[in-house]
Regions:
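Phosphate-backbone recognition surface of nucleic-acid-processing proteins
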Residues: 44-62, 242-259
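Short, solvent-exposed positions on alpha-helices
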Residues: 28-35
Length: 293
């Protein structure tokens, strides 16, 4: 009645533990991860495999990824970790830092083609076609990536190289530098501001929340909506002051708590550095916002 060649079922928590190992120890692929779990007693113990138990096939991650995404397991996993830290008194519910970074999409600039482009002749090289886009004006309004339609052409600042990217945003509490929330949005120029408001809405408690925001765009947002943010989100902006005028009054700038907050803001950059270098998220391994996020 049942096939004899089928694979045994895998508990979702074991898949999550294995993927956590992949990020913590910078394992570049899931196939290599299975090889290392096979001969590492430490990895087997952490994942929950006996010494004589066979490891899974690397395609098990691919086949189960959609199920994990549909149930939003990664978000729930982070929420449980944050809740345990909060119960242990390791997090603050008052002082936070919000910032965003660009994560390079798994798509090349050659795939960034005009939206209304008509069918062309076959390329000279199907594996790596020649595309001459120098001197041509390209924007997200007129072009779209054929490899990853959700990726947007963006750059972090003036003079920086523009790449197909997503906007990764973090909410970090300042007391211990723990990540308490994360949002991935399209890099559309408003992502950091939208993500900041979205994550601050989810901060528990009734106390007033202070949020240090690092970007110039969000500073302009705070100058226009500081009253709205304070009333609706129990949030008071502690943005970095600018020369030639700032949205922050002098009383806030000279307060000892503000100076301490400015020194703690660097911790969110350390989180971004770990995610990009150790967890290997500098260049994403999946496509489409639903899968990447």
């Amino acid at each position: 009645m049942y096939a004899r060649c089928g694979r045994p079922s895998i508990a979702p928590e074991k898949l999550l533990r294995a993927q956590l190992l992949q990020m913590l120890y910078s394992v570049r692929s899931e196939r290599l991860l299975m090889e290392e779990i096979d001969y590492s007693m430490l990895y087997r113990w952490f994942v929950g495999l006996y010494l004589d138990e066979e490891v899974w096939d690397a395609t098990s991650f691919t086949k189960n990824r959609d199920r994990l995404l549909e149930a939003d397991v990664a978000k729930k996993f982070l929420k449980c970790v944050v809740e345990r830290a909060r119960n242990a008194g390791l997090t603050s519910e008052e002082h936070f830092t919000v910032d965003g970074t660009l994560l390079e999409a798994w798509a090349s600039l050659k795939s960034f083609q005009p939206k209304n482009q008509k069918a062309k002749t076959p390329p000279d090289d199907s594996g790596n076609p020649t595309v001459d886009f120098h001197g041509k004006r390209r924007s997200n309004d007129t072009h779209i990536s054929s490899s990853d339609p959700d990726a947007k052409l963006a750059r972090k600042g003036p003079g920086k190289e523009a790449k197909l990217s997503y906007s990764g945003n973090l909410l970090v509490e300042n007391r211990n530098g723990l990540i308490v929330n994360a949002e991935l949005l399209e890099a559309n120029g408003r992502a950091e501001r939208d993500a900041a408001l979205l994550m601050l809405e989810q901060v528990p408690g009734t106390k007033r929340v202070t949020a240090g925001v690092l970007t110039r765009d969000t500073i302009r947002l705070n100058s226009l909506r500081s009253v709205v943010i304070s009333e609706l989100h129990r949030t008071w902006p502690e943005t970095k002051a600018r020369r030639g005028g700032s949205a922050i009054d002098a009383r806030t700038v000279h307060h000892p708590g503000y100076l301490l907050s400015q020194r703690r803001r660097k911790r969110i950059e350390e989180c971004f550095g770990w995610l990009k270098d150790t967890a290997m998220l500098r260049k994403l391994k999946h496509r489409e916002l639903f899968r990447v996020g």
